[in-house]
Amino acid sequence: FLRGTPILVQLMLTYYGIPLVLRGLNQEYGLDWNINAIPAAVFAITAFAFNEAAYMSESIRAAIQAVSPGEIEAARSLGMTSGQVYRRIIIPNAAVIATPSLINTLIGLTKGTSLAFSAGIVEVYAQAQIQGGADYRYFERYISVSLVYWALSVLIESFGRFLENKMAIQAPESVDISGVGGDR
């Protein structure tokens, strides 16, 4: 469901749906939760968290499945337990594989937060609209917003490259692989 529906729809379902559920719980169990005291940001964070969890879990699942079965078999033949295989082989290799995808998802999340305005949250985009309405200089405001999002994306991407370089496994230079795969 989460990967098949737009984040804007999920934001609206969360923003309007959670208070309905809480109101029902209040009536059913005699609770005294003040629904109006919950900030709109809580609903937006909930929607973004569930949405991103759906995409990130798929990236992590694919990365785990991409770990070479030969490496896992070799670890087991050395007598490693399942826990040791996960800690020493699967998780480190899956982390290397999943990092670029997870960083890309984080960049998408950062840009997607501009949709939180539709749930009544005044974030960067909303602030630009408010200020643009005051002085009718929308274009300059939107250029500023785009530069902020671009700078955040560059920072996240740089952090991702740093992580990738830290986790990179260097192939030994002395290994000759020219004959691998046979002659054709």
Where are these regions (language model features)?
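Transmembrane alpha-helices and adjacent helix-loop boundaries
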Residues: F1-R184
